[in-house]
């Protein structure tokens, strides 16, 4: 990773890093895009995505980090199976694994809701008409 950063600085280029290792991503990324089933579901600065995640899939990824285990014997896992992309589901592809899913999640893909000028998330929980829920990461899931 140090070599990639050195090359990036020397050449003044950007690097796209695709990884499930959020620890590595946190150390090297300025901006983070979280993808699920081939679609970006949350995007923002690394600080925004790590310290104020808004999409339930991002919550699950963050909760699966060892730092959130707090002495537990096992890490958090997101329940269910990813959808088959041969016949993608109608609506939000994460809905069947999302314990916070709303009825509309099974009918319509959410748009990207603006949280800040640089932070967006595709979740109906950010719609002003959605019920207010407490994020498992702390704080409310609302705009």
What is the predicted function of each stretch?
Residues 45-143:
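Short catalytic/signature loops enriched in Gly
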